[in-house]
Amino acid sequence: MTWHHTSLSRLLKIEYPIVQAPMAGGITVPKLVSEVSEAGALGSVGAGYLTSVQLDQHIKEIKALTSRPFNVNLFVPEKEVSISKEDIQTMTGILKKMNMPVHDVSFTNETSYSNYEKQLEAVLLNDVPICSFTFGLPSIEAVRELKQAGRIVIGTATTVEEAILFEERGADVIVMQGSEAGGHRGTFNDSADACIGTMALVPQAADALCVPVIAAGGIADARGIAAALILGADGVQLGSVFIPCTESGAPAAYKAKILSSKEDETVLTRAFSGKYARGISNDFIQKMKPFENSILPYPVQNELTKRLRSHAAKELNAENMSLWAGQSLRLINESMSAKEVLDRLIAGVNDVTESSRKDVNASGS
């Protein structure tokens, strides 16, 4: 059996057990998602910040471009977010003193949950084959409805305990997100400080779970893929390598920072969204360090910085962008199409596994 014939590739009906990470915020546009799926991997829509109408349009565009499987990722809403007006005014004042554009907070728990419910409805109505979840457990009813409709459910976990909760909830696959991963930490079970790395997390999860495991975090080349499979993963999820792709919706300044940054330039920060996320350090993150205790919980902080991030993208100002990226940045130094990225990864894993096989045969002769 070759390396790409795994329980994950069979379950998801994909040729290679490689998942393009569902990066929210405009990166995973339909062209990128469809090109990844067309190349034999699994394209993913990061739908966390999309309205249900926008998601519906994305899904329809992807289906017009490919008949292959793809995934839609949803952010499970916070159970209860209670913030005083005084706290919001304090953070608003801090941002304004920095001459940062501030977005009026329109968030309520009710509107957040309502959009999430409508997103789920869009997934079901449009026959999306795979639905993944981040930031928490979907309801028992949501999982039941998806599975009764024949959809595959994927959970995101940062500890074995979180993964077990997802498996018990009915998830068919679990993404084990190591602390090296770019973007938001998928933590939801009071373990934000654990920061377990991919190499330590994957084998422990593989031993504890009955469902397939996807390794995520710091994987950016063929060696990382091969290592994850050896550690017990049934597949891998890569994000940062797809940000500079020609099909990616990331702003040019963001792509340039990915291609020019090093592994020691990423940090975990709450400055932009109120949740810990790994990204390339910039002026905004550094300016916010003295005000760490005033940063508001997600999604309120995320609402406040919405205009800042939008303005930075338009102005191509990387110093005020949320430049989410993982720790393997030295391995990403060339802009290619999604197909070229995947072709290189697949050929590389073929070479690595063939070389290992020859080494084993030679040592046994």
Regions of interest found by a model, annotated:
Residues 95, 184-190, 194-214, 219-365:
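Conserved active-site-proximal phosphate/metal-binding subdomains
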Residues 1-191, 195-208:
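Active-site entrance/lid segments in N-terminal catalytic domains of soluble metabolic enzymes
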